[in-house]
A protein has these predicted regions:
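Short glycine/proline- and aromatic-enriched beta-strand/turn motifs that initiate or cap beta-hairpins
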Residues: 21-72, 186, 190-194
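Predominantly the C-terminal beta-signal and adjacent terminal strand-loop region
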Residues: 78, 153-194
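Gram-negative (and chloroplast) outer-membrane scaffold detector with strong preference
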Residues: 58-133, 162, 191-194
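Extracellular loop and loop/strand-boundary signature of outer-membrane beta-barrel proteins
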Residues: 42-45, 80-87, 133-140, 171-176
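Cleavable N-terminal export/targeting peptides
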Residues: 1-29, 194
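Hydrophobic alpha-helical segments of small multi-pass membrane proteins
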Residues: 116-120, 148-152, 168-170
Length: 194
C-alpha cells in the first residue's frame, strides 16, 4: 500500500514540477482540452430516448496578453422522435476561436473568459438514410454548415498544468435544416503540454 501511495505522489508531483506558483497563461503555452455536455435541453438522455449531447477536442495556444487561440473539432447530436423512433441529426464542425480573460483572481486560480469562434462543417440527418421503416421519407439530407459561436468559460486551475472547464456556448449555424441556434453547456479538462 505504501508503494502505491509513493508512486501516486511521485506522479502528481511530476505533473506540476518545473514551474513556480502562478505560472499560468504564459505566452506560448499549448494545451489540449476535452469538453462534453448537453445541447439545448441540457440532459444527455430525455425520457423518450432522445439524446442531445456534444463532445469536442481542441488545442489552445496562449498569446502574450493572456488571450488564447482555440483550434478544435466538435461532434454534436440531437435526436428527434418520430413514431417512437429516434431520428438523429449529427453535426461535425471545426472551430477557430479567440478567447479573452474578463475577470480572474490575483493568483489566476479562477478565470472567466469570453470567446468568439468561427465554425464550419457538415450536418447529416438520419445518417444519410432517407427512408424510414414505415415508408416515410426524410427530406433533409446532408449539408454543409457554417456560422459562429459565442462562449462564456470558467477556467479553474487544479494545478499549473491541469485546468477544469465549465463552458456555455451559443452556436449560430446556417445551412442547417433543423434550427440555427443551439446552446451547449459542458464540462471539460485542459492539460498544458509544454
Amino acid at each position: 500500500m505504501q508503494r502505491i501511495l509513493f508512486i501516486l505522489t511521485v506522479a502528481v508531483l511530476s505533473l506540476s514540477a518545473g514551474e513556480a506558483y502562478a505560472q499560468r497563461d504564459l505566452p506560448g503555452q499549448t494545451g489540449i482540452q476535452f469538453t462534453s455536455g448537453g445541447v439545448n435541453h441540457f440532459l444527455s438522455w430525455k425520457s423518450g430516448g432522445e439524446r442531445h449531447y456534444f463532445t469536442s477536442l481542441a488545442f489552445t495556444h496562449t498569446n502574450r496578453n493572456r488571450t488564447y487561440w482555440l483550434y478544435g473539432l466538435d461532434y454534436q447530436i440531437k435526436e428527434y422522435t418520430y413514431e417512437n423512433k429516434a431520428i438523429p441529426k449529427a453535426q461535425f464542425t471545426g472551430e477557430l476561436g479567440y478567447f479573452i480573460p474578463v475577470l480572474s483572481d490575483k493568483g489566476r486560480n479562477v478565470c472567466f473568459r469570453i470567446g468568439l469562434s468561427a465554425l464550419g462543417g457538415f450536418e447529416t440527418v438520419n445518417w444519410g438514410t432517407s427512408l424510414l421503416p414505415d415508408g416515410a421519407a426524410v427530406t433533409n439530407g446532408g449539408s454543409f454548415i457554417y456560422g459562429g459561436g459565442l462562449t462564456a468559460a470558467f477556467d479553474v486551475y487544479l494545478t499549473d498544468r491541469i485546468i477544469f472547464l465549465l463552458q456555455v456556448k451559443e452556436r449560430a449555424l446556417f445551412g442547417t435544416d433543423a434550427g440555427n441556434f443551439h446552446t451547449q453547456v459542458g464540462l471539460g479538462v485542459r492539460f498544458i503540454i509544454n
